[in-house]
């Protein structure tokens, strides 16, 4: 078998020579060597009891490796590491047995080497960190990391197939076991599995890995994020019996008016054990509600298909994420357990109908956000605890959807979104934004790149297809448009007709089930509805949340609530991609752009800080605006004299029975009236009228406000009891009416008799208790006297400027609008007139700016 593998590798290297480089890492036609075919993610355990025991653990513990109950060993931890400036400087024989690595440094796996003292991370939005000449990457400065560690295979794994699993390595790597080449892989965001059984020996085994910072794959990984390298996700060994489940596909939809569950399961077996048993169970909260066994009667009996109708099930959606548990177990002919695995799933349907994306028959509104995987100390290497924290904040701030920008995430993220309830747009690791400055413009029409395009999309779909929370596939981001995307669309729709497929790059002309532009203006939403496109419009990116931002979010949602075809969008983005470090003076800073030590390399400054939350997940002010706009309970005044309020339930599926309403009348920041009540029975997307039992407020010259708040009645997963989910506030006048147009006029403050005087220097208007004067030289108000006190220090000037925000700077606002900064000071008086109009004295000043 080893001889056969070496023959295959030799042929691949010969094929690669056509590119002028005898290396796969500069050849888009070669993206893997000896890598196992992609399959659905699952973790096998020794038996059903152990699988269910692990599944029952709290989320923060459930994903930890447990050697006592599963045939899996973590290779995370301390490895020996050597950093080289390029491939030529990297030792050519470090993978061989007997090579001495004692003088090498230590490094932690998983983790980017740039964040552990080797080289520096680079932040760019669009530009590649090297001159673009696809598929070639620099050879003079293309850092290479050499990793080495030892491991021991448990004796009881004898006779089983043993696999090496890298969950994510950036950007390309080789791996050797005991001096033998085990394989090669590209695509930094999907796992690479290698069958290393032929290379193993009793006792200690040597594992060596060679990672390239840049490869041809880097041309498809040009996301608006930091550029790192290294082994960034977990590494495992795992063992499986030769007779095993190779893959499975689960489709659990809804039928009969979305009331019954339509269960379809396809299992692919590897080397079926004659006389063995495949057993399938479906469990609901620990109780078996369905069970089926099949005996293997032929060595060619590799397919197992099962269909079943579950009446009156509880459907899954983001508001009520009801999950069932699939348990698949295999047994040998003697009835001995071979292995078992579980897959939590929900019954959920996705349809495209009447220009809308329907979840369980409802045109849900996607109150979404884009989320990069980011940690303020470890970059792309994140923890399960941080994932749970993200979901907790999203749920508490009324978000219900996430786009995995712009690559497949760690598998734990999908399991958690299944459990806690978030809709997911799962995005392939395809972005070649930097090609827009290249003569070719895009790689999507280059036939040499069809293979990596297809592998990146298909492998993501194959891994993630059993995740209920995924309601849309995305083919990538900002890579132009071309025939490769049409090929990806056709393949994905054929393989998985149960979900829509989207891509923003082609605009209205793209093969995309959803029109999903980025940063469309508010008027573009109205245009989409008017032109009657047959697709829903869901913004893949909008409301750029950089600095003081999201100020016009309500403008978008006024239209989204009005038109069914507008179904929301995904804010850019969730978390600032900054680092918690100290500057040269020892002061703590949030580092961005060029702050991380790479001198002389272009960077895009603080454009990586676009989050609703900071890198440590502390809250930015604008997330409160998002919470308000995204809230599910809306209040509208009907008639304050009768104390009536209209309440609208904008949930997609649930009523308001789990919420209570608290009302308060406040003045000068203090409550003077308050009360609490239940909401009336209200189905999703319905309205009702309620009466607030408040007393009329006194006419005492104070400002009074009515504040309405909705709170949770009980604790829910990640959301505490008493959590505020919605609020509204209106100003009241003494008659109890809302001040719809709160204004004041001079007649409220002064006697109705106004005298005027005009001199060469000024125009003056005088009443019983006030005097206002305007300069005839420049038109400025020079005096505002009220009750004997001058209220202004000097002449008032109009100001057409404010402090710039980050978004202003980023879109060249100063260049476009800078002329207005000093317009008030540079004003030239054109005319000043005084006349009486309807018993009112009007002073009109006309100024040119």
Language-model-detected regions and their locations in the chain:
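Accessory beta-strand-rich segments of carbohydrate-active enzymes
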Residues: 24-36, 43-44, 80-84, 112-116, ...
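Intrinsically disordered, low-complexity Pro/Gly/Ser/Thr-rich segments with frequent PxxP/GP/PP motifs
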Residues: 293-312, 669-700
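Surface beta-strand/loop "capping" patches
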Residues: 242-272, 621-658, 745-761
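Beta-strand-rich N-terminal accessory domains
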Residues: 21-93, 707, 712, 736-799
């Amino acid at each position: 078998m080893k001889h056969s593998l070496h023959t295959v590798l030799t042929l691949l290297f010969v094929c690669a020579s056509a590119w002028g480089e005898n290396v796969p890492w500069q050849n888009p036609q070669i993206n893997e060597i000896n890598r196992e075919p992609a399959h659905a993610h699952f973790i096998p355990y020794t038996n059903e009891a152990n699988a269910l025991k692990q599944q029952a653990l709290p989320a923060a513990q459930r994903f930890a490796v447990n050697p006592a109950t599963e045939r899996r060993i973590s290779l995370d931890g301390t490895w020996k590491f050597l950093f080289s400036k390029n491939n030529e400087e990297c030792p050519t024989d470090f993978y061989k047995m007997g090579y001495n690595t004692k003088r090498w440094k230590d490094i932690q796996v998983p983790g980017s080497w740039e964040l552990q003292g080797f080289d520096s991370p680079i932040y760019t939005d669009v530009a590649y960190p090297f001159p673009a000449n696809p598929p070639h990457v620099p050879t003079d400065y293309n850092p290479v990391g050499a990793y080495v560690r030892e491991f021991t295979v448990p004796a009881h794994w004898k006779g089983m197939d043993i696999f090496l699993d890298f969950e994510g390595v950036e950007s390309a790597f080789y791996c050797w076991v005991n001096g033998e080449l085990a394989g090669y892989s590209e695509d930094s965001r999907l796992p690479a599995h290698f069958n290393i059984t032929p290379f193993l020996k009793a006792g200690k085994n040597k594992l060596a890995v060679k990672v390239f910072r840049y490869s041809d794959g880097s041309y498809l990984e040009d996301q608006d994020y930091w550029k790192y390298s290294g082994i960034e996700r977990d590494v495992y060994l795992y063992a499986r019996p030769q007779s095993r489940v190779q893959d499975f596909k689960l489709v659990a939809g809804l039928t009969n008016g979305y009331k019954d569950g339509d269960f379809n399961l396809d299992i692919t077996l590897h080397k079926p054990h004659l006389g063995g048993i495949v057993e399938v169970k479906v469990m609901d909260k620990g109780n078996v509600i369905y069970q089926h066994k099949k005996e293997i009667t032929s060595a060619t009996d590799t397919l197992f298909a099962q269909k079943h109708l579950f009446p009156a099930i509880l459907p899954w959606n983001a508001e009520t994420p009801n999950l069932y548990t699939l348990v698949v177990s295999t047994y040998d002919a003697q009835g001995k357990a071979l292995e078992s695995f579980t897959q939590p799933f929900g019954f959920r349907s996705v349809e495209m109908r009447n220009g809308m994306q329907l979840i369980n028959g409802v045109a849900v509104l996607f109150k979404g956000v884009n989320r990069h995987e980011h940690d303020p100390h470890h970059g792309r290497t994140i923890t399960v605890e941080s994932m749970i924290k993200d979901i907790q904040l999203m749920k508490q701030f009324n978000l219900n959807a996430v786009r995995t920008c712009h690559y497949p995430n760690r598998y734990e993220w999908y399991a958690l979104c299944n459990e806690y309830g978030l809709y997911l747009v799962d995005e392939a690791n395809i972005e070649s934004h930097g090609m827009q400055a290249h003569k070719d413009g895009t790689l999507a029409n280059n036939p040499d790149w069809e293979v990596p395009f297809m592998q990146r999309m298909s492998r993501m779909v194959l891994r993630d297809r059993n995740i209920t929370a995924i309601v849309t596939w995305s083919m990538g981001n900002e890579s132009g448009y071309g025939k490769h995307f049409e090929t990806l669309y056709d393949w994905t729709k054929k393989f998985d007709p149960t979900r829509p497929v989207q891509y923003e790059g082609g605009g209205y002309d793209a093969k995309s089930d959803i029109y999903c532009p980025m940063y469309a203006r508010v008027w573009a939403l109205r245009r989409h509805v008017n032109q009657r496109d047959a697709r829903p419009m869901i913004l893949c990116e909008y409301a750029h949340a950089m600095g003081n931002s999201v100020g016009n979010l309500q403008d978008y949602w006024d239209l989204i609530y009005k038109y069914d075809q507008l179904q929301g969008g995904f804010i850019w983005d969730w978390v600032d991609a900054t680092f918690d470090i100290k500057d040269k003076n020892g002061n703590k800073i949030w580092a961005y752009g060029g702050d991380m030590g790479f001198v002389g390399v272009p960077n895009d400054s603080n454009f990586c800080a676009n989050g609703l939350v900071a890198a440590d997940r502390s809250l930015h002010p604008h997330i409160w605006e998002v919470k308000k706009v995204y809230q599910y309970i809306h209040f509208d005044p009907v008639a304050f004299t009768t104390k009536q309020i209209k309440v609208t339930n904008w949930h997609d599926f649930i009523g308001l029975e789990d919420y209570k309403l608290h009302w308060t009348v406040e003045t000068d920041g203090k409550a003077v009236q308050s009360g609490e009540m239940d909401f009336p029975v209200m189905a999703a997307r319905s309205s009702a009228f309620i009466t607030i039992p408040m007393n009329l407020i006194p006419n005492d010259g104070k400002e009074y406000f009515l504040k309405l708040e909705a709170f949770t009645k009980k604790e829910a997963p990640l959301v505490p009891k008493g959590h505020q989910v919605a609020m509204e506030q209106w100003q009241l006048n003494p008659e109890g009416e809302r001040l719809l147009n709160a204004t004041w006029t001079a007649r409220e403050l002064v006697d109705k008799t106004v005298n005027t005087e005009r001199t060469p220097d000024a125009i003056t208007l005088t009443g019983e208790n006030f005097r206002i004067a305007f300069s005839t030289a420049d038109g400025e108000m020079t005096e505002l006297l009220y009750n004997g006190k001058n209220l202004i220090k000097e002449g008032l000037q109009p100001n057409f400027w404010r402090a710039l925000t980050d978004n202003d700077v980023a879109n060249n606002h100063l260049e476009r609008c800078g002329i207005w900064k000093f317009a008030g000071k540079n004003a030239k008086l054109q005319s000043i007139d005084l006349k009486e109009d309807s018993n009112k004295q009007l002073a009109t000043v006309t100024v040119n700016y």
